[in-house]
Amino acid sequence: MKQRPWLFLLPALLLVSISAFIPLITVMNYSQLTLLPGTEPYFSGLENFVAILEDEAFRAALGRQVIFSFLVLITEIPLGLGLAMAMPKEGPGVGLSLVLLGIPLLIPWNVVGIIWRVFTRSDIGVLPAAFDWFGYSYEISSSTFDAWWTVLAMDIWHWTPLVVLICYAGIQAIPEEYYMAAKIDRASPWKTFRYVTLPNLRGVLIIAVLLRLMDSFKIYAEPFVLTGGGPGSSTTFLSTYTSRMAIGGFQMGRGAATSLIYFFIVILISFVIYIVMLNLGQGAGGDQ
Amino acid sequence: MNKKYYLILFLVFILVPIYWMVNMSFKPNSEILNRLTLYPHEFTLANYKEILSSEFWRAGYINSILMASMNVVFVTIAALPAAYAFSRWDFRGDKHLFFWFLTNRMAPPAAFMVPFFILYSNLNLIDTYWAVALAHCLFNLPLAIWILEGFMSGIPKEIDEMAFIDGHSFPSFCWNIFLPLIKPGIAVTAFLTFMFSWVELLLARTLTNEAAQPITVTLTRSLGAGGWDWGVLAAAGVIAMIPGAIIVYLVRDLLATGFSMGRV
Amino acid sequence: MAEIEVRDIRHVYDAGTADETVAIDDVDLTLQDGTANALLGPSGCGKTTLLQIISGLLQPTEGQVLIDGEDVTAKPPAERDIAQVFQFPVIYDSMDVYGNLAFPLRNGGVPEAEIEERIQKIADLLELNDILHSSPSNLGPELNQLVALGRGIIRADTSAILFDEPMTDVEPARKLTIRRRVKEAQKEFDITALYVTHDQHEALTFAEKVAIMRDGRLVQYDTGENLYENPVNTFIGHFIGSPGMNLLGCGLTKENGAPHAQIGPHAISVSDDIHHAMDLSWTDCHIGIRPSSVTVQVADPQDDTHYIPATVSQVEMVGGYQILTARLDDTDVEVKARVAHDYMIDEDVSIWLRFPPDTIQFFHEEEAVHAP
């Protein structure tokens, strides 16, 4: 009977080995080789890693990535939670809101980029025209500031609905009696949120935060189509840098090393956040 | 009441850029480039004709739907027993394994492009549905196990025990009792899995050439070839968006129950 | 510490849609100051809806709620000073027991020194002293329910406390202890209490007066004794008591100049008062008698016409008694009777039953008939 759990995990493990483990081994292998076209690969140890860590462009991309992911989390999580609380609990409004919220999620990522590109381009977009009318000169292709907040707005547009859906699920699971009790106990709306909604949503919020964190690190197609990483390299994020190294560059070993460093960073940050959130609010007692 | 306005405001924010693209897709290029109009003054279907007359697009659609569906099947079949094991039994290393599964979702697709290409070339799977459907398990399987585990943990273990006492065999218990209980959870999982597979571009592009090319890739390639023809681009965007909208509309009730069962 | 009155309450869910359901219709009820009351009825009879209307969580479609004569129908729950304990323990998980008890007071702006004093008092009463600084998530449903109760009665201005089937999550063995503490708290603070349940035993042990609802209507509001002895209709007769009252369909015949109840070939005498109230034109009549009032005799009573021959069909041990079911001979009417636990009787034995006239209730069209 001791083997039973593993029997149940077998299909998943098989699938993961094809889709993740074997490729990961390959990446690790490459990362320690120097692979130049036309020559035999030779072992170069940690050389690739050192070269990347010393690369200014890598550090800049990493810095931008961390700031971007941070901004994504502090805007999308509260916004999504607030929207989930504003969702109707029953009636025809539920289906309608779910459909509208689901649309951005089901648009291919490059199309998301296209939508925002035609929306914000100075020659054909309506957004620059609208800003112009208010007296603000909006220039996505030359202003770093405009490019940045537009990429962020696009990410909020694209991914906040996922946060809303996850939080909405969590809110629906909170028994109505908790809110009734809070009413009877004369709790203000803020206290109701603080002592009823928030503690009951902790598990769900961990999922939302981790999912957004991991996925914001992977952002690639949308800014690629929208800004092409510019102006300059001001919207070039870690994933863009990595794929440039992995496909665009000649040096496949270096690309592999970049991927591993990237992978390591995401796991580290996710792990820290996971542990912190798990212990948050735990001071007074156990889980649920 | 103001809560409602907050939601409505956001829904408008979602719709405005989409409207702008739809609006543009019905305009000739002369109108797009020369003046800013809030609705098409010179209404035309030419952009759509150009796209729909191409065999590529139709094939892209079908390929996308088949690949995403295959991925949903693979992921569900593997994730259900795994999630069951995590939710029901304590075994050596379960916490570590669970987190290790999760880390796979963090893997950058960019990092896996080349190894995937090599692996699937060796397996002779390049440019088949199998390649993409299997590759997408990389990020979908962890998510599915994670969500299903949540749903299953919400169902008391006593239900399992009662069923076995009542003389159900394990398969009969799964089919007649357990699966019906977590049906909404499966629906939510399948929806998210389908969604992430449907919209993924990088791996799909690496692993397909022509025969199995999904719509996202068709879109990028036709862009590269045709230059920036804004009207056609917008129409292509609209076309790539429609299946998603239809799917959400069709499963909205399932989603409403799944999400209101509230275990994600 | 107040009198609660609901007047002409009617409540309709989903009004104007296809799902329209009338949950409560035409309910009038006055709970006197400082009394313990129960609201009893089968599931879905509108008990919980009425409770929520009193606490202000629901607005009634029609009617008024009055507290000490003041109309509070339009007031939110926070302004009514009514506490409510729910079916499962509603606890603020992120605070310890002390924080939970202090929550309603802090929300009301009570100074900390006074809060501490109140908590001490409540903790003494409910025996929560040892766990004041524990996290509720480790305490189990019984203690949590006590904490929820404590949170209800901690406010000095609590005028009434409502219980919505609070024992659902509590293990049977612990129900007694919990109920004792609840009862003590109610007495100590002289709080008007309303206890909703579908368990008559719970209702009758907790409350001085019990209101019984059925299909959204209030059927009878009375002391336990009256409910048992003078049910207003067959529903109450059957519902109260375990097993409930025997309800025997009967016809009316004229005998010795007065109307008599007739079951098959057997004529049954009822009290004189009721005989005078009967009308020979009535149909749909029942006589009702408690199983404990039926006299059972094995020996043939010879010429005593008050005895009716019957055959035992079933004997069950219930509590400290035996309940036997017997069919009246030449009819298909079954009667339950209570006999002592050591009474020697077997199935298929012929016996004689007597229904003492003074213990018989008479129902016409389901309603009790009283002396004119």
Residue positions per predicted region:
Chain C
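Conserved ABC transporter NBD signature motif
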Residues: 63-71
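ABC ATPase nucleotide-binding domains
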Residues: 81, 91, 96-235
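The feature captures the beta-strand-to-loop junction immediately N-terminal to the Walker
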Residues: 40-42
